[in-house]
Amino acid sequence: MIPIIILTPKVIVSINGNDPAFRIATDDCIAICMRTAMYAFLLNLILKIENKKVRNVIISVVVLSQILIQGLAYIGVPEEKRGGPEHSDSSIEVANELLSTFNTNNTELYRYKDINQNLTENYPLVMDCPSISTFLHIVSKEQVLTHSQLGYTRNNTKLGDCGGTLLSDAILGIKYTLSSDEMDNKIYQKDGTSESGINLYEYKNMLPYGIIYENTEDIRTIPEEYNVYETQNYVYKNLFSKNEDMIQEITTQKQKIDNNGDLTKYKYTIRVNEKSYLYMHGNESNSKIYIMRVNGENVTIPWINNQDNTEYPYRYENGIINLGKFENQDVEIEVVCYKEDCNLKFATLPLEKFENFISNYKENTAKEINIENNKIKIKIENAKAGQKLFLPITYDTGWTGVNNGEVQDINRIFNTYISLDLKEGTNEIELTFIPAKMKLGIELSIATLVIILVYTFGIKKLIKKDGILDKIIVNLGFGIYIIITVGFYFKVYLMCIIQTIKQWIGLIE
């Protein structure tokens, strides 16, 4: 009750753009302190009322009034004052429109990608479609780190699906792209445009969902020291038994051309021979770009609250950036950065080589994959001994499986994906996902409920109230509760603070 009363923002009589409910400035802090003293005095008077029923009614009215006023305070606040589209319902309206226009809920396997970040990371939940994007925060450390290592944008544990390359999209089953810009018609096929001006594209050529591969090396993890391009080539070469890199990293030197206080201007000159996409990537720890120009043209790096953003890397946009398609030319890239924080890495993806790879890829097996609720059903015929199936689905100990009626081992690959060993001939596989600790949680909850019922309706009636035995049982139960509660808060909250401080110390050292 007291936290609800004390921590609520001040009552707003008139809602307007200059005084939004979300702002807690100095005057608000003073108002909270004054109101806290007032409520403390008021509660002291209320608690002196001897009539328990009257006392409880008055306290309830006070608390509910504050909750009601708090709710009303958020009505009418302009979108730009409450976090922009990212934290308002406008992005949900756009996602609903896309769902209605493109029937995204009919897509079972292949994933979607919001390349301009017109939506929040949770758009797949609204559009009922597959995607690597998520705002749920319930993701593993391996999933978060691999997401970044492959060059997709990430804001702490919010995973976005913009970034990456044509290669990583193909491997991860990202077939459909939502974009407010026109896409390369040599690579993409346009499927339609929504009323909000967002286009739906799909790759003209695509790898099958799930890759049959042969590899006896230990590829459960990806070397931590690999950059985004090395990571993509590592995955590509190990899945498809290739010796050459698909993505060609470029070694180039930056040239300082201007220095004005905290702002420094650099120029990169990159020679691109065969027709290629030119990619760029930078880390937030050593790069802070304010403006970027490619052959004199400004580069925008959009995100949901600012489609004209030019900062990079930004906490909302820090994945691989596609700078465009070039052939037989020198590409000049000018950047204006903070002081000298400019450590960008460039690479090219030769389009003819990539398209030939996709077009010529063949699997000598018949494969069917169906996903429904928490089950994945897979049928593979004509498999050879030693072959494996790569699934671009997050590995978790909660997965169990059977293959032809026998237990199927589920292996981790590339830090966070699933690999299945296949049997020679026909494989009829069914995978089922149940959160790893869910059964234990249910069992503990039932056991706790049984103990409470036995104590309340059994033991408590047989022992003396407030007697020694009663006090021992109550204090023991309360002690266990405190230990569990403190442990929970330590694990969820305090450990995060400790880890953050350790990271700060590491950066200082």
Task: Identify what each model region corresponds to.
Residues 1-82, 427-430, 439-509:
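Membrane-embedded transmembrane-helix bundle of lipid-linked glycan/lipid transferases
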Residues 56-62, 109-112, 175-176, 198-200, ...:
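Beta-sheet entry/capping signal
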